[in-house]
């Protein structure tokens, strides 16, 4: 036994993991094995077994930094480290951080057993850190991991797991094996493959995504819509407007929702037309109406504001609330003034939704975000509201305008104010001083 190994053993007996790490780093392992000096003579198999056990002791009892340092030792030990590391990785009772390090270290070993173990962890673990580590480890193994997983696609029993594992390795090498399962009988296999393939800009993929729009499984259609929605570069070439707007009528809400998002991101009036056609239909349920309102908000054109204004006239409170919020988030200067006046007209209307406190509160917040001086009079009017939350939101919005404090002081001296407004102005001025 070398002198350094003897010192390492003593440090382990003392529980001095930091010192043990220092000695382990000095041992002639891996590339350093041929550079041994008198103190660190070449190690035999028995010595290597002892080094492995010492390193495992640090992994078991050390703190994060000590585990981080000892992780560098295991790859130098070679294949003898694989089995005990896999045992740690698969021990559900073991410390999660230790299992995380075991998996991370295994990512340094390009070995079929390692790949199988990491794949199993991806399938069974409910801990996000562990599964993320396993995916990263598989990715670091590169083509060998892809080849091993691709071979599992031939077996129906392992196909879903292999597809899920391949989907975690975002490398171009996974495209071909995943393309081989996009028509698999199992919907979960198809949807997983479609989701992963959508990450790549490869000419083989768009036709697959278009075909998947007609899949009988909603999960597959949903992933295809999401993937195509990210391909703005192919919007006209693939006629995505006409392909995706059909999915606005899908029986599955999540598919409809993703189709609306994709159309909204396109930012075209034609997309707004398609969204409004469904939004105004009495058959469209309120949750979907809200999704479509949000999507219209992303289009950001004057026509969008026209459609949102028309929708306000017959909207439920829930839908009207979302429209108010969407209009309040308008950032384009040319549209802000229009949005402000749409909201003012709505407040002054006889529509039932406009009379509710929650809508008035949202109106105040929207005007504060828009920052258009044309909303000041409407905000002052809200100070007369009997609901505290409406008044407080109006006050908060008024503080965004530099001249309103002076205007409120002048109003406070006006004897013609209604008692409710006079009280609201007084409260606002008092709040201003806080």
Residue ranges and their predicted role:
Residues 3-6, 43-60, 79-91, 111-125, ...:
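Amphipathic alpha-helical scaffolding segments comprising HEAT/armadillo-like alpha-solenoid repeats
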Residues 380-396:
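Short, positively charged, low-complexity/disordered linker segments
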Residues 4-5, 11-17:
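Active-site-proximal segments of catalytic enzyme domains
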Residues 10, 21-46, 66-79, 97-111, ...:
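Structural detector for internal amphipathic alpha-helices that build alpha-solenoid repeat scaffolds
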Residues 11-14, 26, 30, 91, ...:
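Surface-exposed polar/charged interaction patches
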